């Protein structure tokens, strides 16, 4: 019996974590042909990272293609693309080795674009600078605000970037720029990103692209000519690949000009 791809990717992850950080290349591939538009990934991510109402790390965009009577509804989940040339980092005013956002080169998160909530000044320049709309400023709202008591599930801390962040009052990350980070706090503990684990249709692949034995590397190799990235013309070199669409430009209305 063939292994569930989650089992395979879990084994790949355990192997990847034993490799030197500089030899790993975390990547994600999303096969939109399998997406049922259930948004389980969106909700699981919001729960994992304690996101405010209406603000998402991984929205699922939907569009219609074709003409009546041959119409088709297609979907595109959009996490942060973890660009190798991230425009958001370039426009951040808090620079330097102890800056607010950067392209990580060391440790578990090597290759990811993280945010240091303690250094972020909430200016929003990175939000405007991301052409994919993958960042937002935490608006400080709660789902149960206006009720007699905020529910505990909203005020317990998240564990992004390996630290505890109690999202209460004006505590960080309220007011900070926020974004997807491939759930590096989970990866550091040997778990796959929450969006990958929660996908009931198994449309997401994650792992070390540099490991030829990993499932994601093999899927990328087998489908190389068919793979697409969002706004390739920008030269940002995203680490999130899409399979199953022939033209991603139909989703451009969701992106910044």
Say what each PLM segment does.
Residues 1-257:
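Non-ligating segments of multi-cofactor redox enzymes
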